[in-house]
């Protein structure tokens, strides 16, 4: 959660953050930390949108928590109007990011989470695009 919290403090709006990892790898926990960092109040119960597909939270900017687990195929995603969320003023965090068709996003920050046992997780960050490379550099400075 601490990495998510730190990242939530750094975003400016309009970011797309893809979360990749098996069930139980910590994707939703990462979003909880992110929500705290961006100023979503503790009264907002951040939970997986597996069944609602999209949860929206209010912080210093809107946070769109999207879960594509149950809508893995592009034709199943068609009615979600994902582009409105992905390219709006808020920040979109997309669980099961690998299910988003590649043509939907040009630049993004992808975070792969791996459960190592117990409470340990490994996070790998990949920035695609200058904006996200800069964001990742800022995040590194926060944790050093």
Give the predicted meaning of each segment.
Residues 8-14:
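Phosphate-binding P-loop
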Residues 17-19:
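Hydrophobic anchor at the beta1->P-loop junction of P-loop NTPases
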Residues 23:
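The conserved Walker
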Residues 27:
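Conserved lysine of the Walker
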Residues 75, 80-144:
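Short phosphate-coordinating micro-motif centered on Lys-Gly-acidic
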């Amino acid at each position: 959660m601490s990495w998510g919290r730190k990242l939530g403090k750094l975003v400016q709006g309009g970011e797309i953050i893809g979360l990749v990892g098996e069930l139980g790898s910590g994707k939703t926990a990462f979003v909880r930390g992110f929500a705290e960092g961006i100023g979503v109040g503790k009264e907002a119960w951040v939970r997986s949108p597996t069944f609602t597909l999209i949860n929206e939270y209010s912080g210093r900017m809107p946070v769109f928590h999207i879960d594509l687990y149950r809508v893995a195929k592009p034709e199943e995603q068609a009615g979600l109007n994902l582009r409105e969320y992905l390219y709006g003023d808020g920040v979109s965090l997309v669980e099961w990011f690998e299910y988003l068709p590649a043509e939907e996003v040009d630049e993004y920050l992808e975070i792969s989470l791996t459960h190592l046992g117990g409470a340990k997780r490994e996070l790998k960050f990949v920035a695609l695009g200058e904006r996200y490379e800069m964001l990742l550099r800022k995040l590194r400075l926060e944790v050093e």
